[in-house]
Amino acid sequence: MKTVLEYVWLDANEKLRSKVKVAEGNISSLEEVPVWSYDGSSTDQAPGDHSDVTLTPVKLYPNPFLFDALLVMCSTEKREAITFEDSDGYWFGFEQEYFITNGTGKPLGWENGEPGPQGPYYCGIGASKVAGRDVVSDHMTKCIEANIDITGTNAEVALGQWEYQVFSKGAKNAGDDLWMSRYILERVAEEHNCDINIEPKPIKGDWNGSGMHTNFSTDSMRNDASKGIYDNILNKLEQNHTAHINVYGQDNDQRLTGLHETASIDQFSYGEGDRGASVRIPPQTVESNYTTGYLEDRRPASNANPYDITKVIIDTII
């Protein structure tokens, strides 16, 4: 018997790469997956005269593109930079926004020029309101088949812009799941002859950018919490605002302008139900009188590295 293993990793520019190994035997656990390597000189990660880079498996997923096969998430430098004691008590919910584009780089629905102003597209239905739903639905189904806890999808504020949400427990696990969900999204788009754009402001002008709002909580935030606990966390986030912005994605200044449901990149703010704040306090938290809940960090850009996000949040608040 043989097992098809598809190894997934990040190159020097944090772009996803993959290669396939047909391995002997019925492989079903991480310990059985062989360490492999690739040509790092072709990914800007090694010189040509010393080009072998090791692929170290860290998590397995059922491969939704091939029956009885596995996707292998491999270790990265930023994943290994998470050195605090990781815990399933750290909960993360990423809201990944993105545009689906055609071969020329234009968002779907923009082929004949700029559409009407934003307003009818958010959670819209109908051929004039959305574009690319087949990609979105296929991606959702394949994430479920890969045992990724995708919790929802919706059309976003601009035509051709979408969002999906992924929930995970543990800082490293959350990063693994988000990266693999991105990999599956790009593979699905490939099958539909489309591309995925996760730049934070791909469409200039009066259009929303793309973010990756990050919902997070710890055991103490969910169990017998208090307003004081939440105030302390918010104060720590404010004190470390610059450190967060530094790892919250490239070109995020183009998105965090204080317009289009964002706060200014230069100023930290928070508020109950405020989508124009750096950190939104959700209604569930407020309605519990701050005894249980979570916070939504609205600063991360759509292209941010989730390992960076989980690390800086936990480093800040613990």
Task: Please report, for each region that a protein language model flagged, where it lies by residue.
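Glycine-rich, acidic/polar active-site loops that bind/position phosphate-bearing ligands
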Residues: 1-318
